[in-house]
Amino acid sequence: MAAKDVKFGNDARVKMLRGVNVLADAVKVTLGPKGRNVVLDKSFGAPTITKDGVSVAREIELEDKFENMGAQMVKEVASKANDAAGDGTTTATVLAQAIVNEGLKAVAAGMNPMDLKRGIDKAVLAAVEELKALSVPCSDSKAIAQVGTISANSDETVGKLIAEVDKVGKEGVITVEDGTGLEDELDVVEGMQFDRGYLSPYFINKPDTGAVELESPFILLADKKISNIREMLPVLEAVAKAGKPLVIIAEDVEGEALATLVVNTMRGIVKVAAVKAPGFGDRRKAMLQDIATLTGGTVISEEIGMELEKATLEDLGQAKRVVINKDTTTIIDGVGEESAIQGRVAQIRKQIEEATSDYDREKLQERVAKVAGGVAVIKVGAATEVEMKEKKARVDDALHATRAAVEEGVVAGGGVALVRVAAKLAGLTGQNEDQNVGIKVALRAMEAPLRQIVSNAGEEPSVVANNVKAGDGNYGYNAATEEYGNMIDFGILDPTKVTRSALQYAASVAGLMITTECMVTDLPKSDAPDLGAAGGMGGMGGMGGMM
């Protein structure tokens, strides 16, 4: 086992604090509308330019192992805030730095660290309740656009784009992709879309678009390969009599069956299109069941004793329209019952809660979106790859922030909400004097985000903080325009969830750091002695010394 280097008391805390400050100072320059960029070197390719706090934090590793431990603990604050709310990472880092610095000063002055931590925890619990009381619902697209704009570093075009995304609803899946031009674009897919196209180009009935478009078709869902046309004849005859088109979604349609369907389509006997079912294995079975729920049909599966020959029109699903191209199939307005669809969504949600891997969770979330919401794709436009990466990170932050805003509402932005909360809790007391100091440490730290935003804007933090504290309600300082007023009227909003998560995670990790008394790390390995000069002729295995 490697030898360890151990530091105690003030020695340990000073080293840890240095690491905290290095990381936090690098991250906090990005805060606010006038925050600066940070350039991150990459081992290959162009450097990354970012204004995203967590991206900066993730890049920082310090040479001194004790300092690095402090930096890594603050990195954890940023990561946790990012995981919980998808934004607010810089605010969380600034809060953590403020609590650690103030807290360690109190420890150095002789306060009991455990009581300090209890005081901080008490203040944060009370602050979370106050934040909830200040929160107002965020439902209209104007407020959503404002939240998106603030989170995307005051980029109004991104804010407006994200406000349009509410077309896919709360359950919708939103993906961010590289665009092809300089402008940002938004594609919204109505209905259920999956990534499987037609099995034969002969099904195409819209040559100008290269797509198959079928109005009010029946939809046959089969969890098996179909190669024998005899199995399908009863269904095909029933569909032909009904005078409607047919879409077949099966594990595969091949050989004689596919050839016969193509011939029937080309002769105009019955309009048919066949596609492979999406997914593989158990996921394919589940997705077929999703489509069945959406279209009011039944999956023909031999596992439950159903045979294709005995299928009737009652077993088929229906939709208002189906569009199939080379790579995708979109089912629009399935006729499934709303209660059945909601039941299916609830079932998938339960699976999301029980899922252990991020991959499974993501795939299940996509299924919820396809059944209940829709899919929106934001295509980010930029002139260079470096700009594209930076912009995608901002769009991603804005997306998470707007989701958080819809979930828990919004509070006044620009650090004002935390200043108001701190003022309301000024009379809060603990069980002893040391806990009272802990409460004051937390309340003083709540001013740090406002002070940092002002500092990044080139103004004097103390002057602005005092002016803001002299006001009440949503009165604050707009760093972008350098004027005071109602932050809600200015359109400067923060999602309550983002502010709450930032405060909770910052206090949690900072409290642990304040109560640290000892740090242990591996001693750096001393270089092994150079054995290249030892006796022995090359290739003689050390026998040279025997001659």
UniProtKB/Swiss-Prot annotation:
It catalyses: ATP + H2O + a folded polypeptide = ADP + phosphate + an unfolded polypeptide. InterPro entries: Chaperonin_Cpn60_CS, Cpn60/GroEL, Cpn60/GroEL/TCP-1, GroEL-like_apical_dom_sf, GROEL-like_equatorial_sf, TCP-1-like_intermed_sf. Signal peptide: none annotated. Its EC number is 5.6.1.7. It holds the Pfam family Cpn60_TCP1. It is found in: Cytoplasm. CDD domains: GroEL (cd03344). GO terms for molecular function: ATP binding; ATP-dependent protein folding chaperone; isomerase activity; unfolded protein binding. Coiled coil: none annotated. GO terms for biological process: protein refolding. Keywords: ATP-binding, Chaperone, Cytoplasm, Isomerase, Nucleotide-binding, Stress response. ATP binds at residues 30-33, 51, 87-91, 414, 478-480, 494. The keyword Acyltransferase does not apply. Its main location: cytoplasm. GO terms for cellular component: cytoplasm. Forms a cylinder of 14 subunits composed of two heptameric rings stacked back-to-back. Interacts with the co-chaperonin GroES. Together with its co-chaperonin GroES, plays an essential role in assisting protein folding. The GroEL-GroES system forms a nano-cage that allows encapsulation of the non-native substrate proteins and provides a physical environment optimized to promote and accelerate protein folding. Belongs to the chaperonin (HSP60) family. This is Chaperonin GroEL. It comes from Klebsiella pneumoniae.
